[in-house]
Amino acid sequence: MANQLDASVKDDLKTQFVTREGTYRLLTLSEYSRPNRVGYSSNQSSPQVRVSMVTLPSPAQGKLGSDVGVGTPVGGGTAGANTTTTNGSSPGASPTGAAGASTAISNGGAGGDYSHSNHNSNSAGNNTVEARLGGGISMHSMMNGGVVDQNGVATNQVLGGDRICFNFGRDLYVYSFRGAKKGTEMSKPIDKKFYKGTNPSCHDFNISSATPTGAPLLVGFTTGQIQLVSPHVGPREVRKLFNEERLIDKTKVTCLKWLPNSPHLFLAAHASGHLYLYNEELPCAATAPSYQPFKLGDGYTILTSKSKTTRNPLFKWVFSTDNCCVNEFCFSPCGSHLAVVSQDGFLRVFHYDTMELLGIARSYFGGFLCVCWSPDGKYIVVGGEDDLVTVWSLHERRVVARGQGHRSWVSVVAFDPYTTSYTNWDGGDFSDDENQMNEYSHSREARFSGDSTANGGFEGFDRNSTPVHADRNGPHSASFRSDASSAEKLMSYRLGSVSQDTQICLWDITEDVLRHPLVLRQPANSERAYLNGGVDEEAEAEDGIKVIRPVAMSGQATGQQAESGSCSPTREAAGGGTGNGAGEHSNSSSSKFSTANCTISSQSSPDDCDTEAATPASTSSNAGAGSVAGAGAVASTKQNNRNHGTGNSIKFPNCISATKSDSIDGGGGSGSGQRPSQTTSGYNSKTSNSSNKSSNSGSGFSAFNSLTQRLSNFSFLSSSEKKGAGYEGSHSTAHRQHRKAMSMLKSYNQHNHTGGHNNHSQSNNSSSSNFGHSSTLDSNAAGAIGSSSTAHSFGSLKLSRSSHHSSLATAAHASGSAAGSGSGVSSFDPMQLIGTPACPRFDECPLLEPLVCKKIAHERLTALIFREDCFLTACQDGFIYTWARPGHATHATQHLSPGQAAAPGGTVI
């Protein structure tokens, strides 16, 4: 929370910070808040401050001679056709498209209060909305009710540009966003609304229906209503209210999103855990709607209205887990996938058109609060009450990494699409160290100036540093650093997260972590294990590499290592089992890798690149390029004539560490007919002794000694299960050649519970017992109504457990016979998901550290939006801050001094 204190964290606010691309600076002239700013006022009980932005088309692109507002349907048939084209043959789009094409809305809204027939009925409807919401006092009349020109447009109206909308308490403000180049006119908001009876909780602009005069704005309220405000020429704006009588849902609206490229469809989430699909052209039912099942899936049900006439809501999504308050949902960049996070701690990923559940992920503990997609749609990042940032792969259907840096709940996660790059790093190691940052500040500003690309300003920079958007005069990221002058280029994702601890964290996540089979840094015969990025002098002399936290340096990269080290699932899938040559290279050379904020390593194998986990059979050859061996317990099973590849050995004994598996010492003699290092198990006795010593040396290795890390050492299995796992792993050596999954290292507490084993190799083998047997749901686990052949299957999710556990298929089949809608509830049992790809243990997947972690506000942060020239953050006290990117701070001299508070007041205890 915002009042959480940590003696190791400085309490002063940062007005600038340095990253690899340069210095980000706070612009006080581009700060947004209430026009009549007063002193600090607590907003703890009010809804979270949200920020929405939209870019309007220029007046030359729009048609200003029309009298029709954006929210008014222009040609019902066209609207219906557009909706159907956007969503394909979506069940959610088909009835809506038909209604949009055939229904004439003359009595729209709830109770017939709204009409598109004439202006008077619009005014009457607006009065009803104001009565329902306690007045809804608006400045729209003042801003748009002045003198009009020959086109009927107000002369004082701002056309085109960007709009920013934010809520604070019971107020809703809309400003013209001027970016980092111009200051804010706080006294001239485009629109201001004050609601007496309820508080706005979320909002969203419709980009597809935007005109130079504005864009339709959806506003959700704490009492459950949804308001649509459409720009309209004249003194009155068009307003419509959905769920007016609260007959559909009485709980708070937690998230609102327009469907991608749809002018009329939007999705609303409520605190009740339900999702509703609306068409803004259709009225709501005058009575409480009744539903009938439309589609049943594993853990979810989709209902549709029984009404003979098409009315809102069109569909209702119900999830069958307890405490399933939907906190946020997000559509993929392509618009075909939907990611939903809820208070029960689950991430659910759907194919929206077919309403199929593609995959799930479980939080380490607590609920998930926020979600976002990577710009290329390959990864989903979620944040929640476990203080972690979790990265989930769409192609592999598993958690591929976690990030630890926040000390409280993560409020917002967002990708920065403007700093994703292919590059190498030739500068120093900033690693959030301000003493080293100043040394590069002036030189980096010159390198990363706004016109550096156009003027050839990268002469001193690495020739291999080529941004993805070469024609963009923006900042560049250098995430894959190498003091060994590695020529290999990797894609780096820049991720930002803000939290209730008032800090912002920036992460550089490279594909060598997300896709590459992790490779050991130390030699095969070494007895040392690096814990938390520690530096070993002798290892440095042997490898010529120094480990620096939070950034690991890469080693010497040869042509063979580039070939064997780069993850190429497509090549492996095409080659089948003819990868012995590559396997020998991978097994003989422990190629090094570097990430911007992760200190991890393990032994690679060509089998590690051979997974097509969770990709459909029809797309496995293409989607295989994004799939690698899981960091969880994934088995090698044949399903739909696909070979799911094996995992590698990733060990994290204490937060962040680098160890090796005993398969290295075994050479390649694990079977003449199999690939070398086909089976990887736990620690050998040498590394086990080393890790045990390090565990006794204290718990201060982690830079972030939070409750999350402390709880990570606790096992979630019963003592009998631990004992069974220990004896099975110690004495059942016959299964070793059949285990092609990643060997998993349990926490030190579990090593103690496996007691009686004085031989470290036995205890470590027990800790990495048969996690290779996958358990998938039976193909008949889903309900019979409307469910397709893939809606049920968690085989693609590969929710595997150790062999001493009952499979999820058995549990689902046993519990699913009682009720069709709850057939997959057992699949969402948190205890059964722990240790699976959906929820790997804390020491079973790569753990990232932030590139930058700075305290930037007095109150908890609630919003983060990246723009091309800046990024914006919002905090609960109603301030929206603009941070200029390197080379874009034109009025940087106006920023606050370090001793001056950025916002009035202080941290509330």
UniProtKB/Swiss-Prot annotation:
Regulatory component of the Usp12-46 deubiquitylase complex. This complex deubiquitylates the wg/wingless-signaling receptor arr/arrow, which stabilizes the receptor and increases its concentration at the cell surface; this enhances the sensitivity of cells to wg/wingless-signal stimulation. This increases the amplitude and spatial range of the signaling response to the wg/wingless morphogen gradient, facilitating the precise concentration-dependent regulation of its target genes. InterPro entries: WD40/YVTN_repeat-like_dom_sf, WD40_repeat_dom_sf, WD40_rpt, WD_repeat_creC_regulators. WD repeats lie at residues 248-288, 321-362, 363-402, 470-517, 856-893. GO terms for biological process: negative regulation of ubiquitin-dependent protein catabolic process; positive regulation of canonical Wnt signaling pathway. SMART domains: WD40. PANTHER family: AT02583P, WD REPEAT PROTEIN. Keywords: Repeat, WD repeat. Component of the Usp12-46 deubiquitylase complex consisting of Usp12-46, Wdr20 and Uaf1; regulatory subunit that, together with Uaf1, stabilizes Usp12-46. The Usp12-46 deubiquitylase complex associates with arr/arrow; the interaction leads to deubiquitination and stabilization of arr/arrow. Residues 555-569, 595-606 have a biased composition (Polar residues). Disruption phenotype: Viable but sterile with reduced lifespan. Severe defects in adult intestinal epithelium; increased number of intestinal stem and progenitor cells in the adult midgut. One of its GO terms (molecular function) is deubiquitinase activator activity. Disulfide bonds: none annotated. Residues 58-132, 458-483, 554-628, 661-699, 720-739, 749-775 are annotated as: Disordered. Residues 80-107, 115-127, 612-628, 673-699 have a biased composition (Low complexity). This is WD repeat-containing protein 20 homolog. The keyword Repeat applies. One of its GO terms (cellular component) is peptidase complex. It comes from Drosophila melanogaster. Pfam families: WD40 (PF00400).
